[in-house]
Every structure is written in structure tokens, then in C-alpha cells.
């Protein structure tokens, strides 16, 4: 914006060298652009050191000095029509000298390159009578626009010197209606739009000024469209205190008066002449002149202007509407120790409304429209040990975002603002941000003494699976093979089972899901003519199981290759998942974005699965072991989904676990050898070599919140031993370095408490014999060993053959001579089943959640481009600036051939995929070396994080482990050790506060 028609509103002296100046656009139908390049001329054109400093007086305006006479102004808003600056002169100046300098400033900013001076003869009249220039004792700035769209300026100097500066290619100029100056307290206007030819040698210009006419205006009536007197009184109070209006000409758009209070019944304004057509625009503003948008106000003059012929005028009827019923309040805590953001429900705010009446509010409270003053904040420090430092609120009016932020004083468990703090409630959702230090760890922890034991069911062959008449599947909790058999309901009630996992689930690119051979549609893709019941696979049985404290899970990813797993990564992207932590991190953060159509489908599919169960188990089978970055991809996907759900009020989050293949130890030893046994060798080597365990400590990724379920291949290659049960359980908790990295734990005890063993019943026969076949005795022995090691439990693939049916004796133990030889299965674990309630309540969605989640996802499923769709979604919630700015940056980030040397941009199926080749010599994990797609960290500069974090273990510290196996030729890693594996996680609050960069726990 180089050709700017500026006008001066006020000039106020601050000191002998400093003056405050308010400028606005002379053409009141326009607004300032987001970036304005402005000329600030030298005070003395002959002295290069006489520069004038321009400083902003508003937080929405940023001034960047380009050189001695040019500045760049960045405007944070779309409807800004007025700017306030401070001018710092190099010497002492008086007001006359300031006005003279301002004349040069305005003229320099309206000038452009291709200009010429024309001879012009000016004639001035006031109300039809000749006016001498010397009778105008004020600065005179008359703007015009030429036929090319360039603005020009007529000053006193132009009139005195009979010249005019215009574009050399212009044919004519138009002087539009505008305010000119003040004469004896009366405003003087140019009323008519007049055009003059500038192609001749000399141009004759007549400026016909008109002195204003005073008229008294008032409203005919104010009508409040609300249902009850309480709401009517509320709107009356708000309108009386904050209601303002402006009056303008319906024909020319010329504004006669601004910021007039609605509470004043009779107001005198000045118009250029009578008769005149008047229009009214009403709004709400605060004491600082900021728009509030508290209500919708319409005037009858907007459609039918008032025709005024006398010195008294009625301005029609105002109608006042509420834009919403009540606003839902959200209170979120920003932990400066770890960077985590989470809802805070253990405090309440003591507020005062517009009438001064006290109001108490907490998270999820509902507030009426208005402005609320904060008096105190009460915190339950026994439940959540937090230290608050600042409070921030923001509200939107149109495309403008206004912020209020103050520091807090602490008095025991009570906080008060250091200076008056108010926040505006003018939308259906209001968010209050609190900043401080907290040791509230939001990592989904396993409840104390939790034990899981149960079965993994084959969805195709299990007798416990039944097909409903409407096409859906469900569990049959009452089925039994014979009178000695035990049904699932009885097993659960008697505490022999408290977890059931359905196997062989999968997702497909066409938005369909499957459990075994049965395919069904994504629950969000229901046709209008179908009911929700047709998509409620396992939802009824899940409710029955949850009522009995039993968890239902779904196992996804078994017996498929990498390209068939959720997310449908391409072969090229799969290679990235073999790489070092920097490339894996960058890829996961760019892929897991709802603007990515494949991830958008993946997220909807995962939520559809979670509608049927409590959590999803992701199985890393042999085909995926060479791609350990897939674990990181899934951890990032869950984080993005949980962020989106939590900030939109859905407390039931996405839970998951991981299954890994297990190798057995050396045949030379009875117990597994650490060098050979444990987690699959390829997975372990690449996971440790590429330092992926460090990413699982990052707040941008969610560690498995439930447990890791390990499974075994076969015992045909197992070494001979007298205690296979102990051997198998020991194998499941080997590779502590890998397991601690996945689970973000720091010791063997915490790790074992998160590991559940599983065994496939029909292969539990070493060397093809039935000596150690699966049975009640073997299960009890394994349960005893698992309990000794402090494991989470046993979740076994059930063998439902007639030979090995699960009868009641198989569940309870082994009888010999009518005496129980082995302890009860459930007594070995000695677990209170109510410990599952926390997991049940946290994970898995209900019908009411599903509809809300569907609305959340629907915001991304429109005809807009992915970037614009996401930006508008965030913008509606006040989390981002206007979408045009971000759309511009998004286009830059996806422009080919604009990346650094270490960055590639690949186009696939019409989509841009950006990744980096390496961290670079000095890179740290997650640092970018090129100018590719904007990472999630960079987005945080432009929006508030929305927000659920799984912070790291409070006292965990992990040391690097090196595998002695050799890597494959295709594997890639970061040689510079891009992730800091030696960073300790301090649980002390003060250390978190003093050293936030080293604290990743938030404790």
C-alpha cells in the first residue's frame, strides 16, 4: 500500500520533542491493509541526521524501521481505519512546526513515481460566496482520486502556487465528498463529487465549501427482541453503558458523527446542508474505543433512510438482538515448565457482571453475554499443585482479535489480578488462559494395582461373535458349548476375565472398516436414510462389559504390510519411517494434519473404531518391524486427535496400546539371553539407532497410555527348559531399553507394570508335542510368573477348539483328586476389578460424543481448500489470525523449487508432500533446515495451542543404548545425535520454573 490518502485526526503534545498523532484514511470506505509501507520524511531535508522516529501506540500495530525515512507497518486486523503513533523529533518543536511537518508527511505518502505538475487555477467558495485563502487559518488537505485509481492531495501550498501534482497518464481527477476544516466551531465540508479534466494545459478547479447545519437527532424507539424481562434488563444495561452509533449520509457515505452514546436521547450533529438522507450504524464499544460485538443492533434507517428537512430529526427504531443464549466457559492451563496445555477444572473465578453483581464461574460454566470483571481466583491446591502467574482472555469482533492479559498476585490458594482485568463474553464459547507452573501430569496413567487378564478373539471363527439382523456384529456373552463350559458373562462376573480384544480389524482408503471378513462403513459416512443402529457394531456389548468393569479393545494391523496399516503411507513415505528422529519427526508432524486427506480419513476411522471399543491396540508385526517410525506416526496421530477433541469439550480421548513381536533367547541358556532375545532384532536396532525413543518423551507425541501387549511366534525354535512359563514371561519384559523408550518409563518396575504377555494357544506345544499344551495349569503358572515380575497381566489368543475349550476348570485352575492343585487364576492377580473404571470412563465414545465429534470433523469436510478450511476453523475459535495471511504462507510453503538444499517437495496424487533429507550438521531434533511446509511448532506463532498433552514421566531419565547388531543397507539415521537423550526430567516445581527448557514433565 504505497499511495495512501492519510488524514490527521488529532495532534497532542507529550513533550517538547514528542507528539502523539492520530491518522485515518480520508476515503472512509476503505481500511488499512495488513502491511503498509509509509514514508517518514526528514525534519530538515538538508540534514540526513534529522530523522523523525515513528513509534506505535497500539498493540495491534507493529512498526518496523526500514531505513532513515521509510517504515513498514504491520496491522493485526482487517477493519482498522485509524492509527495512533508517537512522533519523536530530533529537536524541540512547537505545534505550528509539527503541522507543517505533518503536511509533508501526508504529501509524501500520497505521492507515486510517475507524476507531473499541472498548472491549476483554484477558485474557493463557502456556501456559494467567494472565499479568500487567507480566511482559512487551519491546515487544508483535500484529497482526490484519478481515473487510474491513484490518490492525490491538494494543500494550501498548491492553491497559493497554482499547481497540482497528478499522475502523468491520468485523464481526469475526481474530488469526492469529504470533511475539509473547521470554521468558528462549525465543520466545513465538500458536499459534491466533482470531476475535472487534467489533459489540458491548465485546469480550472472550483472548491465549493459548505458550512455545516446543526440538527438535533434522537431515536424513535429501542426494541429489545428477548423473551423475558431479565434478559431485557441485561441488554438495556449493556446498551446504556457500551452502546454507540454513527450517522452518515445515505447518498454520499459521508460520516457526520461517530461514537455517539445511545444513552443520550438528544444529540446535536452537524450536516453539510438540508435536506439530507441520514443512515444510522449502531454497535458496542468499550472505554478504549474497541469494538465489543456484544449484541446485534439493527436500525430501520439501514433499509429506509430518514429524510431530514428541519433542525430536528428522528433516527428511526433500533432493534437489539442476542447473538446466542449463553456462552460455554473453558479454562485452560499453560504449563510453562513443560509447555503442556490442558483444561483446569479445580478452580473457580469470582467475577462481577455489568451491574456489579457477583458471579462464580468455573470450567464448563455458562455465562451470559456481557463484560465481566475478575475479582479473585480460587484454586484447590490439594488436588492440583499449581502456581499461577498470568491470566489472559481474548475475544473477537469481526476479523479483529483483542487480548487482555495481566499478572496475578498469590495469597495462599487465592489469586488476584495486579491491575483491573476484564474479559468480554460475546460468542458461544469463551476461553480463559492461565499461565504458570504445574505438576499436574496429564499423561494417561495406569491406575494403581491394575491387572488385565482375558482373551483375544478371532472375529471370523470365535463362537462369542454373533451377527445381528441389521448387519452389525456383537458379542454373545451367554453362549456355551456344553454344561461344563463357562460363558463370557459368567467369567467376567466371577473375575476370571476383565479384558476382551477383537482381532483382525483393518481400515481401507475408501473409508470402510473391517473386523475379520466383515466390512462396514465408517460411522461418520452414514447415509441419510440409515439409522445409527446399523453402525453400532459391538456398542451394546461394550456397554454391558463396561458395566461389569470389563474393557473391550480392538486389535488392528495384524498380518498386513506397511501400506495397509492406518494412514496408508506410500512406499516412499515408509522409507522415511526407517530414518533418524529428525526426518521421522518432521514427516509425522506434517502428515498428521487434518488438511491431509489421508490423515483426515485415518482420524475418522480411528474414532469410528473407538466408538465400538475402549481403546485400539496397534500390532507391529514382522512386516512392519523394519519401519519403527510407524510407532511415532501413530503416537502423533493420537496426539492430534486428542487435541482436537479436548479443546472441543470431548473428554473421552483416544487410547491405544502397542504389540511387538518377541524373539527367544540363546539356546545355550535356560533363560532368554539379552543379546538375542526380547523385542524383534530389526525393530530394536533401528528404534535405538535412530533415537526414536527420544521422540516418545516429546509433548507432541502420546505414549501408549494403557499397556504394551507382546506376542510370541512359536516354541519350535525355543531352547529346552523345565519352566517354559517362566521363560515366556521373562522374554516379554526383555529389551528394557526399547520398552522404556516406548512407554516413557525410567525403571524396570514401572515398565513391567505396563507390559502384558500374550501367547497363542495352539502353538504352545514345543517341538510338536503336547507336553506343554495350553491349559489351565500352564495359564496359572504364567499368571504366577507374571505376578512375580509385576507385569500388567496376560491377554491370550484363545484356542476355541473342542479339545481346548475354555471351561470353568480351565478358568479357575487344575483339579486333581477333586482338590484344587493350582491357585485360582484371579487370586494370583488379586485385583479389584473397579480399577478398570478409570480406563473405561476415559476411553471410548458414546452416542452424544459421536454427534459432537461428527460436527468437529464436518468443519474440515467442505469445498474449501484444506488450508483455508483449517484456518477458518481455528479462526472461528480465536486461535488464529485471518485466513488470508496463513493461506499466503501456505502457498509459499507448497511452491516447488523454493526449498533449501536439504528439503524435497514431492507431488503425489495432486498433493504436496514435504520432507527433509537430514537434520543438518547443527540441527536438533525437530529443527528444520529448509523453507518447506510450515511445521507445527511454527504454527504456534500464529495461533493458540489447542491442547491436550501427555507429559513425560516426572522422574524419568533415559540413557542411550546401542545394539550390537548390524544395520541393513537401507536404514538411515542421524549421525549427529539429534535428540538429547541425556536430558533429565526434574519433578521439582521450582526447577521447572527456573529451567523450563530442560523440563519435559510439567511436574
Swiss-Prot record:
Q: What GO cellular component entries does it have? A: viral occlusion body
Which keywords appear in this protein's UniProt record, sorted alphabetically? Acetylation, Disulfide bond, Late protein, Viral occlusion body
Task: Write down the InterPro entries for this protein, in alphabetical order.
Answer: Spheroidin (IPR008843)
Which residues are recorded as modified (N-acetylserine)? 2
Top-level taxon = Viruses
Low complexity: bias regions: 953-970
Q: Does the keyword Acetylation apply?
A: yes
Which residue intervals make up region (Disordered)? Answer: 953-979
What this chain does, per the entry, is described as:
Major component of viral occlusion bodies, the protective complexes in which the virions are embedded in the cytoplasm of their insect hosts.
What quaternary arrangement does the UniProt entry report?
May form disulfide-bond-linked aggregates.
From the Swiss-Prot or TrEMBL record, give the protein name. Spheroidin
Amino acid at each position: 500500500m504505497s499511495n495512501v490518502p492519510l488524514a490527521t485526526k488529532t495532534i497532542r503534545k507529550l513533550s517538547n520533542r514528542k507528539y502523539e498523532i492520530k491518522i485515518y484514511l480520508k476515503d472512509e470506505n476503505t481500511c488499512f491493509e495488513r502491511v503498509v509501507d509509509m514514508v517518514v520524511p526528514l525534519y530538515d531535508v538538508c540534514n540526513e541526521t534529522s530523522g523523525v522516529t515513528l513509534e506505535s501506540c497500539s498493540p495491534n500495530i507493529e512498526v518496523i524501521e526500514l531505513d532513515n525515512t521509510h517504515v513498514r507497518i504491520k496491522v493485526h486486523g482487517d477493519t482498522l481505519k485509524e492509527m495512533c503513533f508517537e512522533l519523536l523529533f530530533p529537536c524541540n518543536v512547537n505545534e505550528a512546526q509539527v503541522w507543517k511537518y505533518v503536511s509533508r508527511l501526508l504529501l509524501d505518502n500520497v505521492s507515486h513515481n510517475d507524476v507531473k505538475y499541472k498548472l491549476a487555477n483554484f477558485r474557493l467558495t463557502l456556501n456559494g460566496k467567494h472565499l479568500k485563502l487567507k480566511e482559512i487559518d487551519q491546515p487544508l488537505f483535500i484529497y482526490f482520486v484519478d481515473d487510474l485509481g491513484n490518490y492525490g492531495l491538494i494543500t494550501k501550498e498548491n492553491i497559493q502556487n497554482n499547481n497540482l501534482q497528478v499522475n502523468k497518464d491520468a485523464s481526469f481527477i475526481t474530488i469526492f465528498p469529504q470533511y475539509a476544516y473547521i470554521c468558528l466551531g462549525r465543520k466545513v465540508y465538500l458536499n459534491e463529487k466533482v470531476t475535472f479534466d487534467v489533459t489540458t494545459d491548465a485546469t480550472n478547479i472550483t472548491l465549493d465549501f459548505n458550512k455545516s447545519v446543526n440538527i438535533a437527532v434522537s431515536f424513535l424507539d429501542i426494541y429489545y427482541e428477548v423473551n423475558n424481562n431479565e434478559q431485557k434488563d441485561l441488554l438495556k444495561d449493556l446498551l446504556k453503558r457500551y452502546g454507540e452509533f454513527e450517522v452518515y449520509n445515505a447518498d454520499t457515505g459521508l460520516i457526520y458523527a461517530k461514537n455517539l452514546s445511545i444513552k443520550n436521547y438528544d444529540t446535536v450533529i452537524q450536516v453539510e446542508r438540508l435536506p439530507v438522507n441520514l443512515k444510522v450504524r449502531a454497535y458496542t464499544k468499550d472505554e478504549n474505543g474497541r469494538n465489543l460485538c456484544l449484541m446485534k443492533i439493527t436500525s430501520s434507517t439501514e433499509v429506509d433512510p430518514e429524510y431530514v428537512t428541519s433542525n430536528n430529526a428522528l433516527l428511526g427504531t433500533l432493534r437489539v438482538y442476542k447473538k446466542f443464549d449463553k456462552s460455554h466457559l473453558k479454562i485452560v492451563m499453560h504449563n510453562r515448565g513443560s509447555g503442556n496445555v490442558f483444561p483446569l477444572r479445580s478452580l473457580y473465578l469470582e467475577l462481577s457482571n455489568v451491574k456489579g453483581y457477583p458471579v462464580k464461574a468455573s470450567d464448563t460454566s455458562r455465562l451470559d453475554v456481557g463484560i465481566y470483571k475478575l475479582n479473585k481466583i480460587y484454586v484447590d491446591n490439594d488436588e492440583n499443585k499449581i502456581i499461577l502467574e498470568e491470566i489472559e482472555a481474548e475475544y473477537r469482533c469481526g476479523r479483529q482479535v483483542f487480548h487482555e492479559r495481566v499478572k496475578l498476585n498469590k495469597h495462599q490458594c487465592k489469586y488476584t489480578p495486579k491491575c483491573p482485568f476484564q474479559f468480554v463474553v460475546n460468542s458461544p464459547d469463551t476461553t480463559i488462559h492461565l499461565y504458570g507452573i504445574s505438576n499436574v501430569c496429564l499423561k494417561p496413567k495406569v491406575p494403581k494395582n491394575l491387572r488385565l487378564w482375558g482373551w483375544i478373539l478371532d472375529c471370523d471363527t470365535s463362537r462369542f461373535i454373533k451377527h445381528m439382523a441389521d448387519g452389525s456384529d456383537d458379542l454373545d456373552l451367554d453362549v456355551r458349548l456344553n454344561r461344563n463350559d463357562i460363558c463370557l458373562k459368567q467369567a467376567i462376573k466371577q473375575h476370571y476375565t476383565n479384558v476382551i480384544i477383537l482381532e483382525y480389524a483393518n481400515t481401507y482408503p475408501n473409508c470402510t472398516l473391517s473386523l475379520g471378513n466383515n466390512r462396514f462403513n465408517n460411522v461418520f459416512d452414514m447415509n441419510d436414510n440409515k439409522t445409527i443402529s446399523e453402525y453400532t457394531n459391538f456398542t451394546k456389548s461394550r456397554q454391558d462389559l463396561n458395566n461389569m468393569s470389563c474393557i473391550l479393545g480392538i486389535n488392528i494391523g495384524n498380518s498386513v504390510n506397511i501400506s495397509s496399516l492406518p494412514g496408508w503411507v506410500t512406499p516412499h513415505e515408509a522409507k522415511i519411517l526407517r530414518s533418524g528422529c529428525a526426518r521421522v519427526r518432521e514427516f509425522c508432524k506434517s502428515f498428521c494434519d487434518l488438511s491431509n486427506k489421508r490423515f483426515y480419513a485415518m482420524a475418522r476411522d480411528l474414532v469410528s473404531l473407538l466408538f465400538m471399543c475402549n481403546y485400539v491396540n496397534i500390532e507391529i508385526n514382522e512386516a512392519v518391524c523394519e519401519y519403527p517410525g510407524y510407532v511415532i506416526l501413530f503416537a502423533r496421530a493420537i496426539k492430534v486427535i486428542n487435541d482436537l477433541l479436548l479443546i472441543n469439550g470431548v473428554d473421552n480421548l483416544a487410547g491405544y496400546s502397542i504389540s511387538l513381536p518377541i524373539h527367544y533367547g540363546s539356546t545355550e541358556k535356560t533363560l532368554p539371553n539379552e543379546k538375542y532375545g526380547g523385542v524383534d532384532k530389526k525393530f530394536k536396532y533401528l528404534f535405538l539407532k535412530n533415537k526414536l525413543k527420544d521422540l516418545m518423551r516429546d509433548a507432541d507425541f502420546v505414549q501408549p497410555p494403557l499397556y504394551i501387549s507382546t506376542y510370541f511366534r512359536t516354541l519350535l525354535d525355543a531352547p529346552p527348559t523345565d519352566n517354559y512359563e517362566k521363560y515366556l514371561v521373562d522374554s516379554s519384559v526383555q529389551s528394557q531399553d526399547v520398552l522404556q523408550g516406548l512407554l516413557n518409563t525410567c525403571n524396570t518396575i514401572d515398565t513391567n507394570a505396563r507390559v502384558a504377555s500374550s501367547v497363542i494357544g495352539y502353538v504352545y506345544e514345543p517341538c510338536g508335542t503336547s507336553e506343554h499344551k495350553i491349559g489351565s495349569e500352564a495359564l496359572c503358572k504364567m499368571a504366577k510368573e507374571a505376578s512375580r515380575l509385576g507385569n500388567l497381566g496376560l491377554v491370550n489368543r484363545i484356542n476355541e477348539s473342542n479339545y481346548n475349550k475354555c471351561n470353568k476348570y480351565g478358568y479357575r485352575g487344575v483339579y486333581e483328586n477333586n482338590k484344587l492343585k493350582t491357585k485360582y487364576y484371579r487370586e494370583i492377580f488379586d485385583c479389584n476389578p473397579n480399577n478398570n473404571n478409570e480406563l473405561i470412563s476415559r476411553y471410548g465414545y458414546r452416542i452424544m460424543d459421536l454427534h459432537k465429534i461428527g460436527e468437529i470433523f464436518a468443519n474440515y469436510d467442505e469445498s474449501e481448500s484444506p488450508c483455508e478450511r483449517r484456518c477458518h476453523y481455528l479462526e472461528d475459535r480465536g486461535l488464529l489470525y485471518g485466513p488470508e495471511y496463513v493461506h499466503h504462507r501456505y502457498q509459499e510453503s507448497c511452491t516447488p523449487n523454493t526449498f533449501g538444499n536439504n528439503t524435497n517437495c514431492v507431488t503425489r496424487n495432486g498433493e504436496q508432500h514435504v520432507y527433509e533429507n537430514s537434520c543438518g550438521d547443527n540441527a536438533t531434533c525437530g529443527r528444520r533446515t529448509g523453507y518447506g511446509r510450515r511445521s507445527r511448532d511454527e504454527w504456534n506463532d500464529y495461533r493458540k495451542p489447542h491442547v491436550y498433552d501427555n507429559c513425560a514421566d516426572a522422574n524419568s531419565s533415559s540413557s542411550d543404548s546401542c545394539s550390537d547388531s548390524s544395520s541393513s543397507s537401507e536404514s538411515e539415521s542421524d549421525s549427529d545425535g539429534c535428540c538429547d537423550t541425556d536430558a533429565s526430567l526434574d519433578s521439582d516445581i521450582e526447577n521447572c520454573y527456573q529451567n523450563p527448557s530442560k523440563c519435559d514433565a510439567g511436574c
